[in-house]
């Protein structure tokens, strides 16, 4: 029986089944080939994207470097022209005694004090002293505004004892207010200027405002933490031709032209908030410092004053203005400007490219964005590469773009 079974022929595959097996094997080989090809293409694509990302980052870094060179050249040109307008003065005991004596005279004596200070902005000419005397006659009238970097109504809010009196606020500032650390204008920070120029002020004896108007502006010295002279001059070529005081230029025409006084103050962005709130447009930085900050308006897409106050309660306790705090000390202390930008994370990502000098957010805006592995601070590099070409034509970083668009989510959340 077993022999009979063994003698029987083995079953053969039907012709149809054999062809099917051949097709399955061929298909398996094809799948293996395609899988290998796909892996090679993916690797090559990843390498190409990496190279593209590197090339784009290098191009954008080069653009920022060119911008820095342009700012330096503009500042050199401005200083050369402004040097012809500087009016150094040494204010010693004798000069002070003369001013104190003049202050005892009626309005004409106070007009002479103003004239000697060099603060009156009008060019010298007939009627100049008369204009100063007419101003001095009005005493503490809040509506009286001298032709100087002095905001009378604003100064009187800090010195209500002078309002409506016969005292001349500008001469009061020159003889008393400056020494007490009072600010003559929202855009001139006496303490900030004095701290940064202590040696120069000690040598000449002038008040901070007098030094700035006579000498400091022409030398490129900043009058306020939020007014960067070098940054501003680059946007106003006419300053290089005239040598005009940059802060006076900003108040006269620059603000209306939408020029930015500081890297962290975007005038167009702020103006759009004023328009949306139905607020009459004025000098944006002036409005921000006198009202907008308290209202929670944002000076820049990446800085949120309300968020900053919530995160750092000492700012409220000290009655400090959030952006000023961030620019002067907060940024270097590791504080973040808003939910869009994590300072500690940025510094960690930025470290391999070298140390950050100055404010971290300013560093990010001036090229740091293109030095880190995650330009979005939380988005993968491939997302960056897919849209980075857009940024080649913009003077804007990825985070700024997202923040301006209102972003559906916080990138670094």
Regions picked out by a protein language model, each given a short descriptive name:
Residues 2-5, 16-413:
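Charge-rich, low-complexity intrinsically disordered regions
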């Amino acid at each position: 029986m077993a022999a009979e079974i063994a003698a029987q022929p083995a079953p053969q595959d039907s012709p149809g089944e054999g062809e099917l097996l051949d097709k399955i094997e061929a298909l398996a080989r094809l799948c293996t080939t395609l899988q290998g090809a796909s892996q090679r293409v993916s690797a090559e694509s990843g390498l190409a994207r990496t190279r593209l990302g590197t090339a784009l980052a290098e191009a954008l870094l080069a653009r920022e470097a060119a911008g820095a060179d342009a700012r330096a050249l503009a500042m050199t040109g401005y200083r050369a022209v402004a040097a012809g307008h500087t009016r150094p003065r040494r204010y010693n005991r004798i000069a002070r005694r003369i001013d104190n004596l003049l202050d005892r005279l009626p309005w004409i004596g106070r007009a002479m004090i103003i004239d000697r200070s060099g603060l009156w902005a009008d060019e010298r000419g007939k009627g100049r002293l008369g204009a100063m005397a007419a101003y001095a006659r009005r005493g503490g009238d809040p509506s009286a505004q001298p032709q100087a970097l002095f905001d009378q109504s604003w100064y009187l809010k800090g010195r209500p004892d002078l309002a409506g009196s016969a005292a001349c606020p500008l001469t009061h500032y020159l003889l008393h207010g400056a020494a007490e650390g009072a600010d003559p204008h929202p855009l001139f920070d006496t303490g900030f200027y004095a701290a940064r120029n202590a040696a120069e002020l000690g040598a000449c004896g002038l008040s901070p405002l007098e030094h700035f108007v006579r000498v400091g502006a022409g030398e490129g010295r900043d009058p306020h933490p939020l007014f960067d002279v070098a940054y501003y001059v680059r946007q106003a070529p006419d300053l290089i031709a005239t040598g005009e005081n940059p802060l006076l230029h900003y108040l006269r025409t620059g603000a209306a032209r939408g020029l930015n006084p500081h890297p962290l103050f975007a005038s167009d962005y702020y103006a759009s908030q004023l328009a949306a709130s139905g607020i009459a447009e004025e000098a944006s930085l002036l409005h921000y410092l006198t009202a907008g900050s308290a209202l929670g308006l944002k000076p820049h897409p990446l800085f949120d004053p309300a968020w900053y106050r919530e995160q750092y309660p000492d700012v409220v306790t000290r009655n400090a203005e959030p952006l000023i705090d961030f620019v002067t000390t907060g940024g270097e202390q590791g504080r973040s400007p808003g939910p869009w930008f994590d300072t500690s994370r940025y510094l960690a990502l930025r470290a391999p490219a070298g140390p950050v000098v100055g404010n971290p957010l300013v560093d990010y805006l001036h090229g740091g964005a293109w030095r880190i592995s995650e330009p979005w601070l939380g988005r993968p590099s491939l997302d960056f590469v897919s849209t980075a070409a857009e940024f080649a034509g913009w003077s804007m970083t990825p985070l700024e773009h997202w923040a301006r668009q209102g972003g559906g989510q916080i990138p670094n959340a």
